[in-house]
Amino acid sequence: LLISIAIIGIITGIVLTKYGGFDSSVLLKSLAYEIALSLREAQIKSVSVVRNGNDPDNSFDYPYGITFDPAPANQKKYTAFRFASTDVTEVPTFGNGTSPAEPLETFTIGRTMIISDVCVTDAGGEDCSIDRLDISFRRPECTSLFYGAGYGSPADMADIESAKILISSSLGGDTFVVEDARNLKSLGGN
């Protein structure tokens, strides 16, 4: 009986020790899927919105997107927005003071996870020095439009080939969501 109790105690100790890592990896992967689905929802709103017969401001053609900000004050949330302009020469952005973007919904990241970094990739490689990342979609194109605050001029945004959102957990581990210009999403992690 004493040996059985010792074996059960050892197994219980091992399970409880490994639970934090298991819980962290499951929650990170779940959040990565949630972010990917939020991006897909923004794309669907951009290209599949039904035109209202009475649409004086032409809002049918407004781009929709998601903004990610790894600054400490904002790293526990991300925001869906609508860019209230049909000017195709404007890069849809959120929160730069002059932007006609309207916040639609703010998603709060729970528990122990944060958006720890955002990166963009161009022909020169990956750049993680940007302050904020906006990924949006404009009718009739299905391709992703990127804006990296601190990346360069609005004309430089066309050079961005993909974007990465890095998600970290205080319990250990990280994962990421990558969106490329052809609107392909991929998830990964350590």
PLM regions: where:
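N-terminal single-pass transmembrane signal-anchor helix
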Residues: 1-20
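Membrane-proximal N-terminal amphipathic helix
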Residues: 21-56
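Terminal alpha-helical segments
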Residues: 25, 37, 51, 80-83, ...
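Type IV pilin-like appendage domain
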Residues: 58-136
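Small-residue (G/S/T/A) turn/hinge positions that recur once per unit in extracellular repeat modules
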Residues: 111-120, 140-155, 178-184
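Low-complexity, S/T/G/P-rich flexible repeat/linker segments used as non-globular hinges
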Residues: 167-190
